[in-house]
UniProtKB/Swiss-Prot annotation:
Record organism: Clostridium kluyveri (strain ATCC 8527 / DSM 555 / NBRC 12016 / NCIMB 10680 / K1)
GO molecular function, one term: structural constituent of ribosome
Xref: PROSITE patterns: RIBOSOMAL_L27
Post-translational modification: The N-terminus is cleaved by ribosomal processing cysteine protease Prp.
Lineage: Bacteria, Bacillati, Bacillota, Clostridia, Eubacteriales
Protein name: Large ribosomal subunit protein bL27
Gene3D superfamilies: 2.40.50.100
Keyword Cytoplasm annotated: no
Amino acid sequence: MIIMNLQIFAHKKGMGSSKNGRDSESKRLGTKSADGQFVLAGNILVRQRGTKIHPGKNVGRGSDDTLFSKIDGIVRYERFGKTKKKASVYPLEVEELVAE
């Protein structure tokens, strides 16, 4: 009886790990308050990178270009110039407060 010492190799190359399968976490950018919506002072209006929307009346701009309301009021998104947009917050009128 003959005893053979065999080592068997794979006849196809093994599959390595994929180079895909990763993604960065979303930053949740965009408008957080709609046009005509009532907001409180300090509420975030828009989260953005760069000044896609510029701050208007009663709106501040954070260090990461986030727009926020400086007063309680109604949000208005307006155009100025040919291509630019701005967000403003206007205080409620006395008649509007009584009607509600």
